[in-house]
Amino acid sequence: MSFSSSNFYVILSISLTVFILLFNINKVNSTELTSFTITKFSQDQKNLIFQGNAITTSTGKLQLTKAVKNSIGRALYSAPIHIWDSKTGDVANFETLFTFAITAPYSSNVADGLAFFIAPVDTQPQNIGRAGFLGVFNSETYNKSIQTVAVEIDTFHNTWDPKINRHIGINVNCIKSISTTSWVLENGREANVLVRFDAHTNVLSVVLSYPGLPDSYILSDVVPLKDIVPEWVRIGFSAATGAEFAEHDIRYWSFHSELSLVFNNNNANVSSSVQSA
């Protein structure tokens, strides 16, 4: 019996198709979701952990600090966030939108600023005696053990800061930012901040804008979260004052993350969760 080359390629094509189908059958996709929106902070806000001087007010604000000297306040979302998966190596995409206001009695002397941060689940306020660290970091030099990423909105110039005065910064494991851009504080006015992380490119991007004003302040950098923070983290805000001061408020906060997981079907342990405020 003869066996033509055309028959060989037909059989090879069929075999490859069957292999691809079987390979895909053995893969299971799952997505873990975390999503919440807080449009008004209640005085009995059960999904937040308060540290230091942070409180919620009768007017619906999350007040991190009052306009007093030497104050630190932090508020964390109570449920840990699965930011990357150790079994698959997959990392979550996320975005968070928040509205803040910084109000100082004297607009020329404002300190020190606030930060959105991602940190270990057991995170505690850092460097309480030095307000320039914003209650998030304990050093101006890189310290891998901190396992923290932050977006700082800095109102006071310290020795480790860039030459520009007030700035937005992306910080990794220390208070000295890896990227910065200047911004103009509108005393007492609400500003919106959008923070996004793209797991495919490892790009963390920040956009700050004041409603009704034309300028936007934009910043981005590569931040490989899987190499920096633990698999499970907490997210939240921190603010601090020193000899100079201001009231630091959060007026609105939403967060959404998606962790797409691909498992082997033979050993799949698939879960999907949605958390809401």
Curated annotation (Swiss-Prot):
Signal peptide positions (record): 1-30
Organism name: Medicago truncatula (Barrel medic)
Described purpose of this protein according to its UniProt entry: Lectin that may be involved in a cell recognition process.
Encoding gene (name): LEC1
GO biological process: response to symbiotic fungus
InterPro entries, per the entry: ConA-like_dom_sf, L-lectin, Lectin_LegA_CS, Lectin_legB_Mn/Ca_BS, Legume_lectin_dom, Leguminous_Lectin
Glycosylation sites: 143, 269
Record carries keyword Glycoprotein: yes
Record's keyword annotation contains Metal-binding: yes
Annotated residues for binding of Ca(2+): 154, 158, 161
CDD domains xrefs: lectin_legume_LecRK_Arcelin_ConA
Name of the protein: Lectin 1
One Pfam family of this chain: Lectin_legB
Protein keywords: Calcium, Glycoprotein, Lectin, Manganese, Mannose-binding, Metal-binding, Signal
Ligand binding (Mn(2+)): 152, 154, 161, 167
